[in-house]
Amino acid sequence: MRQEGWHTGNPRRKYLSVVYNGIDIWNNLSPYIESFSYEDSVDESDTISISLSDRDLKWSRTWLPEKGDKMSPSIILENWNYEGEKMTVVCGAFLVDDYSFSCPPFSCTINGVSAPVDTSFKESENTKTWENATVRLIANEIAAKYGLELIFEVSEDIAVSKTEQDKQPDSEFLKNLCEKYGLGIKVYSNRLVIWDLKQYFEKSPVLTIVPDMVSKWTYNSTIQGTYTGAKVSYANPNNENTVEILVGTEERLYKTNQKADSEADARRIGESILRNANRKERTMKLTIPPKMSLYATCNVKLSGFGNLDGKYFVEKVSHSLSGKSYDMQVSLSCISRDSENSEVESKNETAQTNGNTAHGNYTVVKGDSLWSIAKHFYGSGSKSQDLYQKNRDLIESEAVKRGKKDSGNGYFIYPGMSLIIP
């Protein structure tokens, strides 16, 4: 790739290091490369694409790639921001999944996907029933099956009383299981990484992006496919009756056919449904010069974009290199606007004033549930029934006033109610 001049004696340089089937081939590859792209994504497998000139017909003859070949590219920048600087983006390990040739001019494109060397992870259909397990136990067994190291970045493991894998590839089954509980999953450099989206949303931004840093941006806001609430059912362990709970509010309701194991399980599934669906509510795409601190699953802050300012989750980072340029396209989903951050801080201050020491009163605000209030004061939503029993008369009478038959064991509470926090 062509070197670009810089304002000191040392030039800015960008180039690739490519290890192909365990052999460093950059010296052989560099005269032919025309462009390279790398996509780092939350919901999809990472991908790479290399476009090459095949004027000597080496790629279509002697160097013909094969599907399943292993590539490990890295992007290297030298003297990019200051003299003597060297930055490296390790893209990971990829398998060649397709390649093509075209003429004229003679050219070759090689595409790779991040996956284990054993392709049966995504292709072979398996059937198995899991009982009295956890998400971590299931993930660990599947990871070991393909020689992957499991990285489980979830603060609390999730119990699974029973789940069935019915003629599904292991990758599809595990992805569906993780999505059910609001977990992300990704294969990267022979590691199977599982993380909690909620925990990642709570991380501090790694970078503040202002308009001067951006060469192009687009913003989109939609309610299509987004929800204010979700209904999830589970079997009451005392009488086996089906109990349906509401997470959120009823304005735009999603009703899932997924069955939960308990109330806590139903709450987590409902919260996960809303969190995943509402990631598309407010989105933004930016084109910026390379920032090595940006990667999928990190958070950034937008500042100077007016009402669009706020905290955003990085959904995808696309690196595009050619002889003339190196740009990054970054896809973001809004976690919270700056105005919403202020509302949350105000709400937290009100909660502290009303008795954040688990002794006193708390005034219900829009969006609250007994579960969320219990989690705030006690650290666990399972204490919600203690709150219900202490405030039962108030909760039931208020539900009747609002036209309900009853409160559904405390599922319906209303803004302005003053609850005793025992």
PLM feature segments, named:
Residues 58-149:
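Surface-exposed cap/loop segments at beta↔alpha junctions
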Residues 124-126, 353-381, 385-389, 412, ...:
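Primarily a LysM-type cell-wall glycan-binding module
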Residues 2, 107-118, 150-218, 410-411, ...:
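Short beta-strand-centered interaction patches in the first periplasmic/extracellular domains
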